[in-house]
Amino acid sequence: MLVKIHIRRRFKEGHAKQIQALLREFRAGAMNREGYISGETLISLEDPQELLVIGTWESMDAWERWRENEARKRFEAMLEIYQDGPTQYEAFALGALTINDTD
């Protein structure tokens, strides 16, 4: 089952070049992983310091393998230096699902 992973980060001002370089390296690392399909980076119109990365993976297992990868953890630690708060993650399944109705 395809999954979309939303990764939300808010960065401190004044480090755009360093952040952009790290994000490019981060994306390149993900692109070489089994199960990676695509990714995009969005900048909030209301708060330009907030970024939303949307990654598409073949499965939750593929995403979790990348999330636990040591190289990814090093990239994450480098990004955290420039962040204003913790990284937030949300996972979504792609496609029609049955929603439980409590009525």
Each language-model region and where it sits:
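Residue-level signal for secondary-structure boundary sites
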Residues: 15-17, 61-63, 99
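Short, flexible segments with low predicted structural confidence
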Residues: 1-3, 18, 34-36
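Residues in and immediately flanking transmembrane alpha helices
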Residues: 21, 51, 71-72
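Glycine-rich beta-strand-turn "strand-cap" elements at beta-sheet edges
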Residues: 40-49, 76-103
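Short, well-ordered beta-strand segments in beta-rich or mixed alpha/beta enzyme
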Residues: 2-9, 40-67
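An amphipathic, aromatic/His-enriched active-site/gating alpha helix that lines ligand/cofactor pockets
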Residues: 25-38, 56-90
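Short, structured interface segments that constitute the first stable element of a domain
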Residues: 5-7, 16, 25
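Short, surface-exposed ligand-recognition loops at beta-strand->loop->(often short) alpha-helix junctions
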Residues: 10-20
